[in-house]
Structures are given as C-alpha cells and as structure tokens.
C-alpha cells in the first residue's frame, strides 16, 4: 500500500492539529495517528532538496500496515534511501509507535547506520501497560532519541505543518502540567528499573524452583579507555525473552539473542574495545550459546561475561553449549552474593532498601558453581 502523503503545501487543519496533538495524558477516541516528519539529507544529487518535510496519516489499527510509521518507512525506502549519503529524520507524532512498528524501525536503523531518528511524541499511548512501556525502551535501545513534545516543538509544527493563516500558536489550558507529567513518566519508563518482587522471584538461585518460564537478563557495557574500563551508562538495563505471540517474533526469541540485537543497535566502534557483563536468571541453552559464540567471533571488539543464577538443563546439549561459550571467550560463572547485591543496587527499584539474601543463597551458589565446573571439565575432556 502506498503512503497517504500530504506535503507542506496542503497543510493540516488547525482544528485537526489541536484535536489530535492535544497533550492530555489520557484520551479516548483519538484513533488517528499523525506523523509530521522532516528529513535532512546529504546527497550527491543536487536536484534533491536538503530538507524534506511532509505529513503522514495513519490509524490505530490492529493491522500494522496502516500505521503511519510503516507508511514512512515505505516512502523513505522508495524515494530517498538510494540517494542519501546520510540523513537525520525527525518525527513529530500524536502517539508513540507500537511494539511492532518499533521492531521494524529497529531493523531499519540497524540496516542503515547512516540514518538517525528523533521521535517527539505529543502523548504516550497506554503508558501503564507493560508492552507499550517496553516498546518505548526498545525504541531508545535501537539508538533512536525519544522525547515528549515541548512548547517550541508544538509551535514549530504549527508553523510548518498547519494551515494557520498567520495566527500564532496558543497553547491550551494545562499544557505545561501535561508536559511535565508526560516528561516525568517517560523518564520513569526509560529508567527501566525492575520491581523488587520480580527480581527476587526470577533470580532466586534455588535449582528446584518451578514455574520460572521467563528469562531475565540484566546488562551493562563498558569501554576500555587508557587501560581502565569506563561504564557506558546509556547501555545499561534489563531485558527478557520475547513471547512467541509477538508479531515480530512468531516463534519467540530468547533474552540472550535480544541482547545480541541490542549490541548491534549500539553501533560500537570496531576500533575500540568493549565489555558487556550480563546477569541472567537462566544460563543459555545450546542454540543461544552457539549464536553468542558466532557473534563474538564476528565482533572481536566486544567481550562478554555471563553470570547466571541457575543452570538451564531442560533441553539436551546444554552442557556442550556452556563449554562452547567458554571456548568462545565468554566465561560463564554462577552468581554469588556480590552479583545479586550488585543487580539489586543497579537494576532494581529498591526505594533505598538494601539487598537481603534469601535462605540458602550461598549454599545454592556454591553447589551450582561446583556443578558448572564439573560440566566444563567433563565436556572439555
């Protein structure tokens, strides 16, 4: 389907702008998504303008094909991509992108490192729902900049995308309060701290636990500078495996592979050296261990350390997978008290409370460490 494109000659009606870009945090019956965009380009084709600015209209529809973000990607690939040496894309959207659109945007940015994206949204869609909060985090993790539209950006859209008849932009009642709320809410979402109960439930290192079907993975990256590892705070957070009912991954995707996706999105400098440390609730399965090993072979500038709370032994071949990781230069160890405490301090919304170990933590850690060493020794022989 071709995008329904409206250029800046035929602008948006003022009433439409005020109705659909109204920044009240909770709104109903706003089923149209407006995407006003600008593309600043560097190109060898002098016949092309350095700045393209237009409007796309999409629907909050179950079929992602009808989303404005998908229209834009289709339009950009078909019209500008081949001619661009580099481009800076800015979106001004009435609603932030959904998880499926974020996945497509992530693929697009990974495929085209010469493209940057800034998303300024008037509102956050269903900010209380986990999937939509995760969509915002994933969008940032891909390298896109996400922000709440402020007064200057509303005024800019009014000047460039609205048929205003020389009337200045006038903000509505409670505009500033709505903006402050949404800005704080976005910061809260992107801070991405785990609930204490979620951490304790999923990271308990009792090997006999049942019902822990999800894998949680906390990660932090460092850059080697003058012989010292310097934290990269922008590359820190936690992820979990993608459910099999997700449109982007019909068969599901394990947390380890999601981490590899993230590292690729970071666009790390191959001439530098980086270290990624992950704390994971289950050790990698054989298939994930293989893919991690291949990734490290293809990206020698990235080092990986893995600390696991428990050993995942539900599928055959897990022992070989653990050995494969060791051979690939990704040493795996079992989490100890210090690791659990570090995760609590770094990745959990602990509200100032210190980490309290659960019963048997040290005993389980020692037993699992002994079992891991035995596996590596036996398989190595």
Curated annotation (Swiss-Prot):
Keywords attached to this entry: Antiviral defense, Cytoplasm, Hydrolase, Immunity, Innate immunity, Metal-binding, Nucleus, Phosphoprotein, Repeat, Zinc
Sample GO molecular function, one term: zinc ion binding
Catalytic activity, as annotated: a 2'-deoxycytidine in single-stranded DNA + H2O + H(+) = a 2'-deoxyuridine in single-stranded DNA + NH4(+)
This protein's domain notes: The CMP/dCMP deaminase domain 1 mediates RNA binding, RNA-dependent oligomerization and virion incorporation whereas the CMP/dCMP deaminase domain 2 confers deoxycytidine deaminase activity and substrate sequence specificity.
Organism: Saguinus labiatus
Gene Ontology biological process terms, A to Z: cytidine deamination; cytidine to uridine editing; defense response to virus; DNA cytosine deamination; innate immune response; negative regulation of single stranded viral RNA replication via double stranded DNA intermediate; transposable element silencing
Ligand binding (Zn(2+) 2): 254, 285, 288
Cytoplasm as UniProt keyword: yes
Subunit structure: Homodimer.
EC number: 3.5.4.38
Residue numbers spanned by region Necessary for homooligomerization: 206-333
Protein's cellular compartments: Cytoplasm; Nucleus; Cytoplasm, P-body
EC class of the enzyme, as a word: hydrolase
Gene Ontology CC terms, in alphabetical order: cytoplasm; nucleus; P-body; ribonucleoprotein complex
Residues flagged as site, Interaction with DNA: 241
Pfam families for this protein: NAD2
InterPro entries given in the database record: APOBEC/CMP_deaminase_Zn-bd, APOBEC_Cyt_Deaminase, CMP_dCMP_dom, Cytidine_deaminase-like
Keyword Signal on entry: no
Record-given protein name: DNA dC->dU-editing enzyme APOBEC-3G
Protein purpose: DNA deaminase (cytidine deaminase) which acts as an inhibitor of retrovirus replication and retrotransposon mobility. After the penetration of retroviral nucleocapsids into target cells of infection and the initiation of reverse transcription, it can induce the conversion of cytosine to uracil in the minus-sense single-strand viral DNA, leading to G-to-A hypermutations in the subsequent plus-strand viral DNA.
Region (Interaction with DNA) residue spans: 210-212, 310-317
Family statement drawn from the similarity comment of this UniProt entry: Belongs to the cytidine and deoxycytidylate deaminase family.
Obligatory cofactor(s): Zn(2+)
Domain CMP/dCMP-type deaminase: 29-139, 211-325
Chain residue ranges for the region called Essential for cytoplasmic localization: 1-62
Superkingdom of origin: Eukaryota
Annotated gene: APOBEC3G
Sites where the protein binds Zn(2+) 1: 67, 98, 101
């Amino acid at each position: 389907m071709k995008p329904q494109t409206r250029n800046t000659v035929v602008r948006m009606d003022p009433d439409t702008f005020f109705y659909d870009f109204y920044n009240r945090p909770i709104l109903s019956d706003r089923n149209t998504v407006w995407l006003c965009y600008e593309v600043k380009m560097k190109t060898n084709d002098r016949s092309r303008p350095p700045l393209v600015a237009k409007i796309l209209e999409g629907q909050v529809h179950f079929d992602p094909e009808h989303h404005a973000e998908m229209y834009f990607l289709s339009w950009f690939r078909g019209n500008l991509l081949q001619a661009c040496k580099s481009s800076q894309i800015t979106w001004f959207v009435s609603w932030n992108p959904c998880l499926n659109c974020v996945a497509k945007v992530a693929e697009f940015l990974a495929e085209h490192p010469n493209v940057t994206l800034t998303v300024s949204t008037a509102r956050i869609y269903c900010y209380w729902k986990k999937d939509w909060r995760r969509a915002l985090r994933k969008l940032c993790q891909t390298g896109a900049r996400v922000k709440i539209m402020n007064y200057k950006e509303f005024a800019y859209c009014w000047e460039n995308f609205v048929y205003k008849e020389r009337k200045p932009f006038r903000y509505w009642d409670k505009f500033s309060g709505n903006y402050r709320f949404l800005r704080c809410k976005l910061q809260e979402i992107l801070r991405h701290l785990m609930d204490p109960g979620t951490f304790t439930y999923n990271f308990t290192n009792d090997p006999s636990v049942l019902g822990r079907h999800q894998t949680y993975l906390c990660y932090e990256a460092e850059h080697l500078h003058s012989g010292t590892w310097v934290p990269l705070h922008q590359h820190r957070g936690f992820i979990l495996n993608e459910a099999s009912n997700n449109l982007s991954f019909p068969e599901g995707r394990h947390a380890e592979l999601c981490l590899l996706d993230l590292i690729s999105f970071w666009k790390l400098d191959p001439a530098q050296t980086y270290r990624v440390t992950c704390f994971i609730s289950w050790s990698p399965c054989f298939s994930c261990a293989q893919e991690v090993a291949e990734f490290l072979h293809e990206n020698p500038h990235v080092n990986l350390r893995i600390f696991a709370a428990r050993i995942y032994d539900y599928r055959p071949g897990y022992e070989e997978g653990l050995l494969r990781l060791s051979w690939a230069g990704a040493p795996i160890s079992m989490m100890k008290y210090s690791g659990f405490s570090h995760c609590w301090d770094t990745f959990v919304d602990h509200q100032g409370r210190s980490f309290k170990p659960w019963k048997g933590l040290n005993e389980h850690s020692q037993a699992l460490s002994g079992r891991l060493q035995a596996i590596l020794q036996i398989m190595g022989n």
